[in-house]
């Protein structure tokens, strides 16, 4: 099986280099990896290294509370953060708490051996998933203390299939599994793993910390002007279709809208703006304008959404009607009632939990969207009830960072 995997890997690497000629994201994926070993030249043989690996931005945010806690406690250690995806690397490549941020090398035997030899980590921390066979074989071979944090396992994964022996064996590289839920523990137990702790999701610690920071934005204060405001975050075209229908046909003068699209491509932003029949302004055009005169504010930049959620009376979180639901924990920590699309949310534990608790609502079409947001606008006590459920859920699920740190302190 190792031979077949490595042969497929070789063929995929050639294919990716070809696709990179025509695809910008794949080009970043391929070209970025050419810089990995140069970036690692700053790591010396005498350095003590802690290595984190995240697939993309969401997984990085799960690891961030641990990175911050380790940086505070182990000031003389160097921290290396690797990403698989350009969407994570491009946004966090200048993360100031890491000594090196780079792409994870392509999973060939020679690459991973060179990589592990170069960084010689005291501990390897894999976030949520990313089970690369050659990489896991190498850390196991070198006896590196390796842990999985915020892990989730599902029945459909190959580990739990009759033909999954190859991947099951790779899990032996982990010294400990820190999982999000009981279901994942049960699954791992069925294939013989007992080195498991249900720690929960470190993102809860991260979002709770958000409440301690200054979340004020002067331009949002000016725009909102104490008016009822719906914040729609990380929206896709499928979400925006429902949102625009509501704004154009049902919104009254006493409600405002802030839209932060997932894709801030200039052409798509302009199309969104032109589809709205209410007075609308873009973030990129806000200077010198009277923001309070506008009813819709489109945020055509990144990095502001978390703070903007603090201004929401209600929130719509995008992705649930498209490729997958985005982060609902951020609006939840502010005690905001949340609505999202009903098609692609079930793999997100927090979404299924909050749906059962009643803190969130789902929609699939324009009629449902209009009905739920009209009800939320007209019933303040309804909004308060949902928001309280969400905020309580966040506070009751913190503590994963401390649990994981207690283990790391014993091993470093």
Please give the residue ranges for each predicted region.
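Nucleotide-activated sugar donor-binding and catalytic core shared by glycosyltransferases
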Residues: 1-412
């Amino acid at each position: 099986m190792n031979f077949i995997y490595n042969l497929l890997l070789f063929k995929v690497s050639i294919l990716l280099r070809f696709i990179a000629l025509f695809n910008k994201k794949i080009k970043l994926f391929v070209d970025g990896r050419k810089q990995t070993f140069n970036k690692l030249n700053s790591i010396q043989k005498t350095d003590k290294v802690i290595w984190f690996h995240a697939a993309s931005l969401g997984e990085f945010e799960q690891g961030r509370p641990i990175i911050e806690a380790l940086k505070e406690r182990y000031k003389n250690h160097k921290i290396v953060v690797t990403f698989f995806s350009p969407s994570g690397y491009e946004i966090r490549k200048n993360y100031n708490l890491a000594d090196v941020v780079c792409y994870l090398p392509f999973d060939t035997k020679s690459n991973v051996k060179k990589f592990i030899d170069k960084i010689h980590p005291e501990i390897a921390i894999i976030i949520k998933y990313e089970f690369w066979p050659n990489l896991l074989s190498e850390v196991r071979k070198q006896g590196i203390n390796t842990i999985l944090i915020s892990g989730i396992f599902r029945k459909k994964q190959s580990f739990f299939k009759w033909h999954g022996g190859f991947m099951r064996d790779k899990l032996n590289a982990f010294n400990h599994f820190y999982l999000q839920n009981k279901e994942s523990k049960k699954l791992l137990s069925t294939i013989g793993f007992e080195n498991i702790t249900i720690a929960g999701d470190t993102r809860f610690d991260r979002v709770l910390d958000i409440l301690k920071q200054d979340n004020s934005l002067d331009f949002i204060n000016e725009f909102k002007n104490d008016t009822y405001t719906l914040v729609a975050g990380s929206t896709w075209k499928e979400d925006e279709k429902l949102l625009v229908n509501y704004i154009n046909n049902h919104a009254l003068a006493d409600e405002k809208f802030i839209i932060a699209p997932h894709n801030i491509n200039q052409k798509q932003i302009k199309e969104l703006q032109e589809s709205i029949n209410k007075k609308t302004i873009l973030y990129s055009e806000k200077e010198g304008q009277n923001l309070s005169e506008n009813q819709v504010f489109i945020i055509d930049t990144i990095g502001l959404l978390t703070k903007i959620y603090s201004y929401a009376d209600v929130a719509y979180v995008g992705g649930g009607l498209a490729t997958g639901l985005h982060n609902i924990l951020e609006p939840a920590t502010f005690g905001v009632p949340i609505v999202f699309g009903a098609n692609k949310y079930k793999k997100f534990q927090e979404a299924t939990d909050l749906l059962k608790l009643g803190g969130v609502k789902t929609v699939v079409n324009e009629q449902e969207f209009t009905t739920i947001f009209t009800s939320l606008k007209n019933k303040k006590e309804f909004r308060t009830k949902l928001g309280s459920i969400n905020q309580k859920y966040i506070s009751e699920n913190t503590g994963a960072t401390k649990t994981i740190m207690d283990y790391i302190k014993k091993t470093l």
